[in-house]
Amino acid sequence: MSGKTFLVMAGGTGGHVYPALASALALREQGANVVWLGARGGMEERIIGRTDIPMRLITIGGLRGKGVAALLMAPVNLVRALWQAFSVFRKEKPDCVLGMGGFASGPGGIVACLTGTPLVIHEQNAIAGMTNRWLARGARYVLEAFPQTFAQAQSVVTVGNPVRDELAALPSPQERGIGARKPTLLILGGSRGALALNEAAPKAIAALPETLRPRVVHQAGEGKDQTCRELYASLGVEAEVYDFLQDMASVYANADLALCRAGALTLAELCTVGLGALLAPYPHAVDDHQTANARHLEQAGAAKIFQQDNLTVERLAETLTSLLGQPQKLLDMANAARTLAKPEATREVVKYCWEACAND
């Protein structure tokens, strides 16, 4: 299998970049040459720039919410991006292209179709993004994290979302002691933080009876940790507040319940480790895909959903009181989450990339 070159396209958010990076590293472990195609100025430029994966950048951005001038320039910008992507293809000569979302995936996927290069796409969310909806028609394989995301497409396989191997290696919820120890509430606002969670969570925890208050580990987001820490202190609540949590395997291993947004990568991690959650979908996500993501966990009994408009201190405190007072319920939710896990997702993505080459 060695000697093949794979062009991995992903960017824009961690939900696209990190699953793609896991797949890229797995491909390299199997002897492949990997090149990354990203958008200039995107977060992928910083994240992949810290690795030794060669990166090629094109100039492309989104149109949602932009003004008239941006819409008028869109055809010109698309042609430029297509030409830049074509130049990358001509130089790198990829044997297969893996598109995992983000702005660069559009031009790169189009060039793959035009040049006859096998294309594999992967959609992380329960509602497919615009780029992947377009590219599904020309893809050799369409991979989805959630069932029925591409109900009408051909060659669709539900594989889950790639996550880090160390998370899949964690013991089961029961072996970790969920339901049999003082609970730890893990609050994740994402790397940039979620203001609604940072404000509501401390007040809700303060409203709990002293005997039910959990240990609190709170990721408040870059530049938001000090304000959040001061709020907890003013309410008389002990909490470990961080801007960003690094060793997530250890963090998850010691958590009994999560309070977080409903991004695809976060939910994949919750299911992989087996951790119940209170989910507050980001209300401005494109096509409200976070709510769709969250529904899968809710239907399995692994989560409860709080829409932004009903994320009140009173309702959150009431739910926390109910769950923290029923240790068995925490264990049941954690076990339900783990039934949704797809620990082989990375290997499945890589397998279909190799198959796309073999069938060329």
Swiss-Prot record:
Locations listed in the record: Cell inner membrane
Pfam families: Glyco_tran_28_C (PF04101), Glyco_transf_28 (PF03033)
Keywords: Cell cycle, Cell division, Cell inner membrane, Cell membrane, Cell shape, Cell wall biogenesis/degradation, Glycosyltransferase, Membrane, Peptidoglycan synthesis, Transferase
GO molecular function: UDP-N-acetyl-D-glucosamine:N-acetylmuramoyl-L-alanyl-D-glutamyl-meso-2,6-diaminopimelyl-D-alanyl-D-alanine-diphosphoundecaprenol 4-beta-N-acetylglucosaminlytransferase activity; undecaprenyldiphospho-muramoylpentapeptide beta-N-acetylglucosaminyltransferase activity
UniProt GO cellular component terms: plasma membrane
Binding of UDP-N-acetyl-alpha-D-glucosamine, residues: T13, G14, G15, N125, R164, S191, Q290
Domain of life from the UniProt record: Bacteria
EC identifiers of the protein: 2.4.1.227
Pathway: Cell wall biogenesis; peptidoglycan biosynthesis
Principal location: membrane
Topological type in the membrane: Peripheral membrane protein
Gene3D superfamilies assigned to the protein according to its UniProt record, in alphabetical order: Glycogen Phosphorylase B (3.40.50.2000)
The UniProt record lists the keyword Cell wall biogenesis/degradation: yes
Broadest EC class assigned to this enzyme: transferase
Reaction(s) this enzyme catalyzes, per UniProt: di-trans,octa-cis-undecaprenyl diphospho-N-acetyl-alpha-D-muramoyl-L-alanyl-D-glutamyl-meso-2,6-diaminopimeloyl-D-alanyl-D-alanine + UDP-N-acetyl-alpha-D-glucosamine = di-trans,octa-cis-undecaprenyl diphospho-[N-acetyl-alpha-D-glucosaminyl-(1->4)]-N-acetyl-alpha-D-muramoyl-L-alanyl-D-glutamyl-meso-2,6-diaminopimeloyl-D-alanyl-D-alanine + UDP + H(+)
Gene Ontology terms: biological process: carbohydrate metabolic process; cell division; cell wall organization; lipid glycosylation; peptidoglycan biosynthetic process; regulation of cell shape
Function recorded in the entry: Cell wall formation. Catalyzes the transfer of a GlcNAc subunit on undecaprenyl-pyrophosphoryl-MurNAc-pentapeptide (lipid intermediate I) to form undecaprenyl-pyrophosphoryl-MurNAc-(pentapeptide)GlcNAc (lipid intermediate II).
Family in the record: Belongs to the glycosyltransferase 28 family. MurG subfamily.
Annotated protein name in UniProt: UDP-N-acetylglucosamine--N-acetylmuramyl-(pentapeptide) pyrophosphoryl-undecaprenol N-acetylglucosamine transferase
Species whose genome carries this gene: Hahella chejuensis (strain KCTC 2396)
